[in-house]
Structures are given as structure tokens and as C-alpha cells.
Design a protein with these regions (language model features):
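Amide-donor transfer/coupling interface in amidating biosynthetic enzymes
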Residues: 1-75, 99, 103, 169-171, ...
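Generic recognition of short, well-ordered alpha-helical segments
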Residues: 51-54, 87, 119, 123
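Membrane-interfacial amphipathic helices and adjacent loop/beta segments
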Residues: 77-85, 192
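Short aromatic-enriched loop/helix-cap "lid" or pocket-rim segments at secondary-structure transitions
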Residues: 83-86, 247-249
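Glycine-rich, highly charged phosphate/nucleotide-binding loops
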Residues: 84-103
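Short glycine/proline-rich turn/loop motifs
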Residues: 89-90, 110-116, 303-308
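Cysteine-nucleophile active-site neighborhood
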Residues: 104, 109-178
Length: 358
């Protein structure tokens, strides 16, 4: 499933340079196969915008080659952005109005930073729900990540996320809860997923709303669930798109915050992430941050260089397989006309015909 570089978005050339297959537009238009058009609503803050963009587009581009993929990043004007980031978005991103007019086959929605206890009080809430309501009736499936999962579940089912006693931060082992679901076809029954969140929606809350639990963890909680129809909305509380060093970057950010007295307590190590020599380096950086805080000296670290080659990615292959399955299922039910949600004969209340199997 090759990506198509249909615009001058730098991520396309970055991925091509890293060895990923990215077709030129000229080559793509001469291939006689049905393409998929995927919206990518990127709500991440400026510092993570391009990394998140690259991570999700890479996942899409890693899928089997049964179709071409046109990925359309877009954002929401209500999100607070720097001038440079606004310039980047204006230059490379699509706008929702255009995508709504031309149609999409599927939609991916990222997380976002929030400032209010209630998600409905965020400036992006109404614009986000406009996108979600349109997508529910117009795309084959919506894939929600992290905070987007909490927001969309609140909107559709009235589920309120609950604060955790401490941040769920690290890499956790999960088990497949629905081995017969097509989204989990040929997936390892046990796999890792990174989490980085302060809030949670529990199995009990999801099941009370009629959702299908797909994968969960004793330590990490529910990672994946599906809407009652089992496909039109897929919810993830973890971050399967993360790079091997994503949690490392978060940890380093917290070390700098502690050294500069922007947080009161020492940051914990992300759970189940550092091991052996990498953990020793992480603890040494923690001590250095504490000393800088006490003395007022400038804090700097070499942690990223110190642990280079010592961090394991134990989730990426499964993430690729799940996204591959998701897009394959989208391909199987979407209409040839991307302005139409499903092909003729597909039941919106049971798009994958799972009721027939019972």
C-alpha cells in the first residue's frame, strides 16, 4: 500500500529518504487501482505536530500494497499555534471544508493538549465535534487516538473520563480481548503499547455504553475498543504510533521542567521502558536534574545520545498490522464514490457483517 506524494508536504520526502515507498503523483495516476483517501486531523501541539504527522503517515504507508493512499493532514483553527506552525499548516495542510466537499474514505484523529478539566470547555470542542459528526455519516471508519478517544466517547456516549491516581506512563503488555474480530486478524495475542495519559475510560464504562473491547492490559487498562457497530469508530487510549524514543523525549522534557522548578516532584521513570544500561543513564540524568535544581545551575543532558541503540521498540510491528487490517476493512466496505459512505449492500449498523457470524 504505497503512499502518494500528492502535495509538497515535507514528510513525504522525509519518508522516501528513509526508505519508505512513496509514489509520485504522476506515477500514481497511471496505476489502474482504487485509491483510498484518508483524512488526518492533527491536533497535537506545535512541538509534536510534525512528529505525530510523520508517525501516523508512516503507519499508513507501511501497509500491504493493495491500494494507493492519499493522506490529507488538516488541523483546527481554534487550536493555539505559533506563527511558524500556522505558516506550515497553511502551506502543507488541507482545510476541512475542502475535504468535506471532496469526500474521504476514512479519518484518523490525534490527541491534543488540554487546559480545562472538562473537555467541552476547550476552544477546539465545537469545531472537533463538527468534524466528528460529519465523519460519522460520511466516512467508513474513524480511528481515534488518546485524547480524541475521550472526546469522541464523551460526544457519542456521554462517557466521562476519570482522572488516574498517577500518570499512566510507560510501555504495557496487552492481550487481545476479541480474537474473532477482523481488525485483530493475525495479530499477536499479546503485544505492547506505549501509554502517556492522566485520565482513563474503563472497561466497565465502555461495556455499559455497548462498545466492544478489543485489547486491554492489567496495568495499562483498555487500549482498543470499537463502536457498537464494531467498525465505524475505533478507539485507542494508547500510542501505538510512537517512535522508540518518544517516551524518552517526554522524560527529558520533564527533567528540564524539574530542574527549572516548573514541576515540584521528581519525574518517575516511564514504566517498563528503560532497562539495563539505559535505566542507569536515565537515573543519572535524574540526579543531574536534581543537582541543577538545588544549585541553580543550567541543566543540560546527553541522555538521548547515551541511550542511543539501547531502547527497544516492542509495539511497532503490531501497530502496523492493526492499521493494515483497518485500512483493508475500509477498502472492503467504502463506496467507489468517496462522497458516499459505504458501497451498496453494506449495513451501517453492521458494516463488517459480524452479526451474520453469530
Amino acid at each position: 500500500m504505497p503512499l502518494v506524494a500528492h502535495s509538497k508536504l515535507p514528510t513525504f520526502s522525509d519518508l522516501r529518504n528513509q526508505g519508505h515507498e512513496v509514489l509520485t503523483l504522476d506515477r500514481a495516476v497511471h496505476q489502474d487501482i482504487r485509491e483510498l483517501h484518508i483524512g488526518f486531523l492533527n491536533m497535537m501541539p506545535d512541538a509534536a505536530l510534525r512528529a505525530t504527522e510523520r508517525q501516523f503517515i508512516r503507519l499508513v504507508g507501511s501497509c500491504n500494497r493493495i491500494a494507493q493512499f492519499f493522506v490529507y493532514p488538516f488541523s483546527l483553527p481554534a487550536l493555539d499555534r505559533s506563527r511558524d506552525t500556522l505558516g506550515y499548516i497553511e502551506r502543507y495542510y488541507s482545510d476541512f471544508e475542502t475535504l468535506r466537499d471532496t469526500g474521504l474514505d476514512a479519518l484518523i484523529i490525534t490527541g491534543a493538549n488540554v487546559a480545562n478539566p472538562k473537555l467541552e470547555d476547550e476552544a477546539f470542542w465545537e469545531p472537533l465535534m463538527d468534524v466528528v459528526d460529519w465523519a460519522w455519516d460520511n466516512v467508513a471508519s474513524i480511528l481515534c487516538s488518546c485524547l480524541a478517544t475521550h472526546a469522541v466517547l464523551k460526544h457519542f456516549h456521554g462517557i466521562d473520563r476519570q482522572p488516574l491516581p498517577k500518570k499512566r506512563w510507560g510501555v504495557y503488555s496487552h492481550r487481545v480481548s476479541a480474537t474473532d474480530h477482523p481488525l485483530l486478524r493475525d495479530i499477536n495475542t499479546r503485544f505492547d503499547v506505549p501509554h502517556s495519559r492522566y485520565n482513563d475510560i474503563s472497561r466497565a464504562q465502555l461495556e455499559a455504553a455497548g462498545l466492544k473491547i478489543l485489547a486491554e492490559s492489567a496495568e495499562g487498562g483498555v487500549h482498543m475498543a470499537a463502536s457498537p457497530d464494531q467498525f465505524r469508530a475505533i478507539y485507542m487510549q494508547g500510542h501505538p504510533e510512537y517512535d522508540a524514543n518518544s517516551l524518552l523525549k517526554e522524560y527529558r522534557r520533564e527533567l528540564y521542567r524539574y530542574a527549572n522548578r516548573e514541576r515540584d516532584k521528581l519525574p518517575p521513570l516511564p514504566e517498563n521502558y528503560f532497562s539495563g544500561e539505559a535505566e542507569r543513564c536515565a537515573l543519572a540524568a535524574l540526579d543531574a536534574a536534581g543537582q541543577a535544581r538545588e544549585t541553580g545551575a543550567a541543566y543540560d543532558d546527553t541522555l538521548e545520545a547515551d541511550v542511543d541503540g539501547l531502547l527497544d521498540n516492542t509495539w511497532g510491528d503490531t501497530a502496523k498490522a492493526i492499521i493494515n487490517n483497518w485500512l483493508g476493512l475500509v477498502y472492503g466496505v467504502t463506496n467507489l464514490d468517496r462522497k458516499q459512505q459505504f458501497m451498496p449492500g453494506v449495513d451501517p449498523d453492521d458494516p463488517l457483517s459480524l452479526k451474520e457470524r453469530k
